[in-house]
Amino acid sequence: MNHVVLSGRNISMKYGHRLVLDDISIDIRAGEVTALLGPNGAGKSTLLKLLCGEVPSHNEIDYFGEPKEAWKPEEIAKHLAMLPQHSTLTFPFLAREVVELGAIPLSLSNKETTELALHYMQKTDVLHLAESLYPALSGGEKQRLHLARVLTQLHQSGDKKILMLDEPTSALDLAHQHNTLKIAREAAKAQNAAVVVVLHDLNLASQYADRLVLLHNGKLVCDDNPWQALTPERIEQVYGYRSIVTKHPTLDFPQVHAAA
C-alpha cells in the first residue's frame, strides 16, 4: 500500500450556524488519485481548502508525517500546490508570466523559469497562448494555464509531492477534460504524487481516480475504489438519483447511467 502523505483527523467546519464538514477523517496516499465527489453543497471544495491550508482552521492536519503548523509557507509551497476553482487574477500579465509565477518558491534562473513554464504550457496545450494577455483568454484557457502554473510550482518537489485540483475540468471541452485528468494520473503514477481532485462527473472520476471519497451534507459516506463506491444504492443515497452502473465496454471501470 502507498504511504500516507497527507492526513486529516476529525475535521469539522462551520459557516455561521451551518455545519459544512462533520467529523471527517481522511488519509491521502502517494501514487494515488483521490477524487472528492458529492452533490452541490456537500463540502468537497471546503474539505480541499482545509486540507491544503487555504482556509485557517484548528483541525488536525499533517503533511508528510509532520503537523501542518510545523511547515513554513515557503517550504510547503515547494511540495503542495493547489489549483483553485476560480482565479481572481485581473492584471494584464502575459500568459507565460502567469505560469512563471509558479516558480516563485523554486531556485531557478530567469532563463530556467521561462523554459520550465513553456514546457508545462505545452503539456497543458496553451503554449500557443504564451504571449497573449491573460484577461483576453477564455475560461478553459485560463484553467489550463493555471494547471501549468501549479505543475511548475511542484517541479523541484522531489519525492514529496501533493497536487490538489478543485474542479479542474469545469470549463473544459471533452478532449481537454481527459487530457487534464491524464496529466493528474501521470503525476501520481510516474512521479508518485498524491493527487486530490474535486469532480462532479462520476464517470470521469471512475476512469481516472484510484479512490472515490463521497460526501453528503458534510459527512463522509464512502472512501473506496470505484467499483465499491459507485453502486446504484450509494448513488441514490448521496445524490437522490436512480442510476444503472455498467462496466465500460473496453476499459475496466464502472460507468453510471440514468435509470430512466
UniProtKB/Swiss-Prot annotation:
Record's GO cellular component terms: plasma membrane
Domain of life: Bacteria
InterPro entries to which the protein is assigned, alphabetical: AAA+_ATPase (IPR003593), ABC_transporter-like_ATP-bd (IPR003439), P-loop_NTPase (IPR027417)
UniProt keywords, alphabetically: ATP-binding, Cell inner membrane, Cell membrane, Membrane, Nucleotide-binding, Translocase, Transport
Localization, UniProt: Cell inner membrane
GO molecular function, one term: ATP hydrolysis activity
SMART domains: AAA
This protein's record includes keyword Cell membrane: yes
SUPFAM superfamilies referenced in this protein's UniProt entry, alphabetically: P-loop containing nucleoside triphosphate hydrolases (SSF52540)
EC number, as in UniProt: 7.6.2.-
Alphabetized NCBIfam families for the sequence: PRK13548.1 (NF010068)
Database matches in PANTHER family: HEMIN IMPORT ATP-BINDING PROTEIN HMUV
Quaternary structure note: The complex is composed of two ATP-binding proteins (HmuV), two transmembrane proteins (HmuU) and a solute-binding protein (HmuT).
Function: Part of the ABC transporter complex HmuTUV involved in hemin import. Responsible for energy coupling to the transport system.
UniProt record similarity statement: Belongs to the ABC transporter superfamily. Heme (hemin) importer (TC 3.A.1.14.5) family.
Protein name (Swiss-Prot/TrEMBL): Hemin import ATP-binding protein HmuV
UniProt organism field: Vibrio parahaemolyticus serotype O3:K6 (strain RIMD 2210633)
Lineage: Bacteria, Pseudomonadati, Pseudomonadota, Gammaproteobacteria, Vibrionales
Gene responsible for this protein: hmuV
